[in-house]
A protein has these predicted regions:
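N-terminal glycine-rich "phosphate-gripper" loop used for MgATP/nucleotide binding
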Residues: 57-61
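Internal anion-binding site segments
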Residues: 186-238
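ATP/NTP phosphate-donor binding region
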Residues: 1-55, 65, 103-104
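Catalytic phosphate-donor-binding core of small-molecule kinases
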Residues: 32-34, 110-112, 164-175, 216-238
């Protein structure tokens, strides 16, 4: 069994000793090739290189997304969470702690345990658990810019994301006009915010789950959350 461990050294909480500890744990069940990312989209290229039976993403949800989009046909994927939120890993039932999660991954590889996970596609890019348009997309864009200008490449905390969303709402007078038109089940709908969920909960705010699409699941079709008008007070009700 050949395993490629792709680790993001800029993920929150990631240190080289932790990466080495995960590599040692996985080497108990497979031949491990360790690769470190050095920037955005690098994990896509690393995941796509031939020669691995299993590709393990170690980092946050951004690293997971890149590995998913680079994964070659026939290769399996595993996740070792090491980011600030690690939504996908938590939705899979993995521990939030990196080393216990690595132990579960090693156990699954040893036993040959696998799980099929349905994916979504937006703008020719796969996503694992959610895709947001409108407010969420703009807040994420702002946070990603600040990540490299103010936070040395590490993802800001959840409060920074909320602050970015509030600034976006403030710029629109604390209301999002219906700027988008979507086609959903044969109907044309105008909306100010759209979220597509592949699993429940949609995301987490620290330890608290954000419950927007409680019927979503990896084994079912995608769920859409459509909001016609959104004000700042509604953020806490989502």
């Amino acid at each position: 069994m050949r395993l490629r461990l792709i680790a993001n050294p800029n993920a929150s909480g990631v240190t080289r000793p932790l990466v080495d500890a995960v590599a040692r744990r996985l080497s108990e069940v497979a031949e491990v090739e360790l690769r470190l990312t050095d920037g955005a989209r690098h994990a896509i290229a690393l995941a796509g290189e031939p020669g691995a039976d299993v590709v393990v993403a170690m980092g946050g949800d951004g690293t997971v997304n890149e590995v998913v989009n680079g994964l070659p046909p026939g290769a399996a994927m595993a996740v070792v969470p090491a980011g600030a939120t690690s939504v996908f890993a938590r939705q899979l039932g993995l521990s939030r702690r990196t080393l216990p999660a690595a132990a579960l991954v090693a156990q699954a590889i040893r036993s040959g345990s696998q799980r099929m996970v349905g994916l979504g596609l937006a703008n020719d890019r796969l996503f694992t658990f959610s895709a947001g348009m409108g407010l969420e997309a703009e807040a994420t864009r702002v946070v990603d810019e600040e990540r490299y200008t103010r936070f040395d490449g590490r993802r800001p905390g959840d409060l920074k994301v909320v602050a970015a969303a509030m600034r976006t709402l403030r710029n629109d007078g604390f209301a999002l006009p219906e700027r988008m038109t979507i086609e959903l089940e044969g109907r044309s709908i105008r909306c100010g915010y759209l979220a597509v969920a592949n699993q429940h909960p949609y995301t987490y705010f620290g330890r608290l789950p954000v419950r927007t699409a409680p019927r979503a699941g990896f084994e079912t079709a995608l769920d859409a959350v459509v909001v016609g008008e959104l004000r700042s007070r509604d953020l806490w009700r989502l």
